[in-house]
Structures are given as C-alpha cells and as structure tokens.
C-alpha cells in the first residue's frame, strides 16, 4: 500500500516542499543543487569512491545543461518512517523533454536531502530552473517484521 501525498506531508516524511508539490500518490521533489561529474568514480566489493563534482552556475536561476550526466540534490528533507520504503521517479514532463532521473531506493529510517542522477539525453540539452519540481517521491509500507533501520553512509546527507 502506498501513502497519499497528503499523508506524507502530515506524517513529516517530506519537509520543505514547494506549493503544488502534493500529488495524489506522492510528493514532488525540487532541484536544490546541480553538479557535473568531474572525474571517474569507483565501486568495489568493499569500497566506493564518489566522483568529485563541479557546481553548475546558473544565470538568473536557470541552468543551461548540455547532454550528459549530472548529480543533483533535492531541496526537500525526506525522512522514511520505520516500516516503509521510498521510491523516486522522474516527472513525466522531464521524460518528454528527453531527460531521465535515476534515484536509489530509500530504506526505512533514512533521513536527508537525497541525491539523484540526471541524464540529459536530448541532443539539444535542457534549460532547468533551480527549484523546479523534477521528481515524485512515493512511499510504500514494507510487509513483514522490520529487522533494522538504515544506517548507511548517506544517513543525514545534505543536512
């Protein structure tokens, strides 16, 4: 069962959302920061090294993004309650512009201003305004006994 957007706000799952962000089945998340990837990352069996990022400078709050991959951070603070899991999807307008947003699963107990990968596949690029709603967070109940809460490296990120 998925929680309604209204319930996500009432339960404090999403804080700092913009006007119009509450949807029937979730809450829209907006762009807070955008970085281009400055070097390669490493993902091994035990270790990981995140690529450095260069903050994108936006003229008058509008970013001119060339085709490629970008890392972005959302404005909103998300707190996934125990017994629930969060999923983030691109808004359909973004897809129709030739762009994709990739998000990871947000486990029970995660709190932070999450990050996502924005892939601009449109050969003409994308003009993206800071603060624009770019993703929708949906939250579902996890069935069965809960054995632990999220304690990973990204707990409290961006706060």
UniProtKB/Swiss-Prot annotation:
One of its GO terms (molecular function) is dUTP diphosphatase activity. It catalyses: dUTP + H2O = dUMP + diphosphate + H(+). It is an enzyme of class 3 (hydrolase). It comes from the Archaea. One of its GO terms (biological process) is dUMP biosynthetic process. Pathway: Pyrimidine metabolism; dUMP biosynthesis; dUMP from dCTP (dUTP route): step 2/2. Keywords: Hydrolase, Nucleotide metabolism. Gene3D superfamilies: 2.70.40.10. InterPro entries: dCTP_deaminase, dUTPase-like_sf, dUTPase_archaeal, dUTPase_trimeric. SUPFAM superfamilies: dUTPase-like. Its EC number is 3.6.1.23. This enzyme is involved in nucleotide metabolism: it produces dUMP, the immediate precursor of thymidine nucleotides and it decreases the intracellular concentration of dUTP so that uracil cannot be incorporated into DNA. Belongs to the dCTP deaminase family. Archaeal dUTPase subfamily. This is Probable deoxyuridine 5'-triphosphate nucleotidohydrolase. It comes from Aeropyrum pernix (strain ATCC 700893 / DSM 11879 / JCM 9820 / NBRC 100138 / K1).
């Amino acid at each position: 069962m998925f929680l309604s957007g209204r319930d996500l706000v009432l339960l404090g799952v999403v804080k700092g959302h913009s006007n119009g962000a509450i949807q029937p089945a979730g809450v829209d998340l907006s762009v807070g920061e955008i970085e281009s990837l400055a070097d390669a990352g490493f993902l091994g069996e035990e270790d990981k090294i995140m690529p450095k990022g260069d903050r994108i400078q936006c003229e008058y709050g509008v970013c001119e993004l060339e085709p490629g991959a970008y890392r972005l951070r959302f404005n909103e603070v998300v707190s996934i309650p125990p017994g629930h899991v969060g999923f983030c999807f691109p808004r359909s307008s973004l897809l129709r512009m030739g762009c994709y947003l990739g998000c990871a699963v947000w486990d029970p107990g995660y709190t932070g201003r999450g990050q996502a990968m924005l892939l601009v596949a449109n050969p003409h690029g994308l003009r993206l305004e800071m603060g624009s709603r770019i993703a929708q967070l949906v939250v579902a109940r996890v069935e069965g006994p809960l054995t632990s809460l999220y304690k990973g490296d990204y707990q409290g990120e961006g706060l």
